[in-house]
Amino acid sequence: MKTAHEIRPGNVIMLDGSPWVVQKTETTRSGRNAAIVKLKLKNVLLDSGTEQTFKGEDKLDDIILERLDCTYSYFADPMYVFMDEEYNQYDVEADNLGDAADYIIDGMEDVCQVTFYEGKAISVELPVHIVREVIYTEPSARGDTSGKVMKPATITGGGTVTVADFVKVGDKIEIDTRTGEFKKRV
């Protein structure tokens, strides 16, 4: 059992007797109230999706499934293909990746964990930190140094990350895949 606050994208939880893949998590904390966790879920058996809201301390039944270390191989619309050390290939539907699809690029060497349910690859968990190149961002605004200045940047793979003002096109940055936050320039 995990609390709702500990659930991450790629985890598989049991709700109402069915396994659900967590595609996205969003935590909201307010001053006096407890944290609220909003989960975007996809049913493994029925391919239906839903959003559920939980209190941060709610207990959820995390299913322990078979996991295998794999690397990304190629994209065969609408499937992402991953390969293990023995060159076995596993297809994962693009819908099951959720936000992780923004960080997957051709030639990436990051080792991912592919999760299986009844022999079918259902989700992928990326490493906690990955390095990607900034392919587009606005130039820094000269003189705007009051506090922590952030701006949007597009990274290889097509995702958008909010980065510090000093980051420019061509820089390699480290990203926390759990939250999608910029960590540092590499």
From Swiss-Prot:
The keyword Protein biosynthesis applies. Signal peptide: none annotated. Pfam families: EFP, EFP_N, Elong-fact-P_C. One of its GO terms (biological process) is peptide biosynthetic process. Pathway: Protein biosynthesis; polypeptide chain elongation. Disulfide bonds: none annotated. Keywords: Cytoplasm, Elongation factor, Protein biosynthesis. One of its GO terms (molecular function) is translation elongation factor activity. Involved in peptide bond synthesis. Stimulates efficient translation and peptide-bond synthesis on native or reconstituted 70S ribosomes in vitro. Probably functions indirectly by altering the affinity of the ribosome for aminoacyl-tRNA, thus increasing their reactivity as acceptors for peptidyl transferase. HAMAP family: EF_P (MF_00141). Belongs to the elongation factor P family. This is Elongation factor P. It comes from Shewanella frigidimarina (strain NCIMB 400). The lineage of its organism: Bacteria, Pseudomonadati, Pseudomonadota, Gammaproteobacteria, Alteromonadales.
